[in-house]
Amino acid sequence: MATSRQLREQIAAGRWDATLAALYGGSEEVLARQRSRYGAALEQFELYYGPGRQVQVYSAPGRTELGGNHTDHQHGYGLAGAVTLDLVAVASRNEDGFIRVKSRGFNKLDVIDLTEAEPQQGESTHSASLIRGIAEGFRAKGCDVGGFDAYTASDVLRGSGLSSSAAFEMGVAIILNTEYGCGLDAPALARICQFAENTYFGKPSGLLDQLTSAVGGVLFVDFADPTAPKIEKIHADGVLPEGMTLCVTDTRASHSELTGEFAAIRNEMEAVAACLGGRVLGEVDEKRFWQELPRLREQCGDRAVLRAIHYFEENARTLAQRDALVAGDFAAFARLVEKSGHSSFECCQNVYCASSPKHQGLSAALAISQSILAGTGGAWRMQGGGFAGTIQAFVPDALIKRYCAAMEALFGPGCCYLLSLREQGAVRVM
């Protein structure tokens, strides 16, 4: 194990270039940026915790939803990919029973006393609650974990739709797993992070984001039994054909007033399921659903029925997307991406709020995407919870400049992220 200064010198000399290239790509421009980024993180660690300490450096990726919009919470399928935007953490184990985490861009140093295992008053919805919950999740698995000091630098920006929270959680989890020799596998780490987010942070999240950051690559997940989801990893190499780039555009609208809108999707789907004797739509016979549409319209309303239609069709579509990726048929995959986007707009109705028709950033982004990409072999769709946030597009390289310029004209400079899929999940880098 090296000191932070030794690692900085090794990185500057290019000794870690092969490792960085495996994570981010091997172009000189990319490597120069990552050398600078890792060196800066190590320097900041020294600033906050002092020089001369032996450290290890970790990476946890963000993720993009590729299919299965609002299907996971109904015990359906999910499809997501890890991306090259990630959180980097420099960490050093300590023996004082405290976890200290300083994150770039945040003024506060999180200090967690591990003798205080229970959720603390006033801590929910803050990063400290995630750290405490993850540590307690390890202990619940019988792992004897202790303190560490860390500095994190995340390129997975908050609100970018790429799950900055899952990247942060997995960064903390991989540090504890490695520094204390716990030996837990990636799915177990993901479940610990979900436990922390649900129980300590106070957000009833699913598991797909954490699984994707933990495992890496493209994940197809069957949530029929959400306590033990079936996970299939599809290798990221070759998923995107030569000359095609994944773009995610942040429409820069706030989710702060949308909790009720998100809840309504789940509530309405489950109201339909209840009419058919199930708790969620994944427990319902689809054939019976179609047979009983008149009764369901009367009892649940048209929007609930349309959202249930979205679930059944999107679930089948997600399985077909998985099959297309395994077969290497990107053209078929792209057609399914478009259909997914149209279903979110027309049936799930989570592209804009009916109560606020003047504000339709996602609608505008999708319309411009269609005008540029239709007939080019590319594809576009909304991703994530909806109503605000981000859209996803697969853009031929010849159209990248035009596409990004159009998005930035609408939503401002820097709104369009050009991404690659990443094979590795959360890992110790050096």
Regions found by a protein language model. Name each.
Residues G76-D96, V215:
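Structural signature of FAD isoalloxazine-binding scaffolds in flavoprotein oxidoreductases
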Residues A140-F148, L176-I192, D397-L410:
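Phosphate-handling active-site elements
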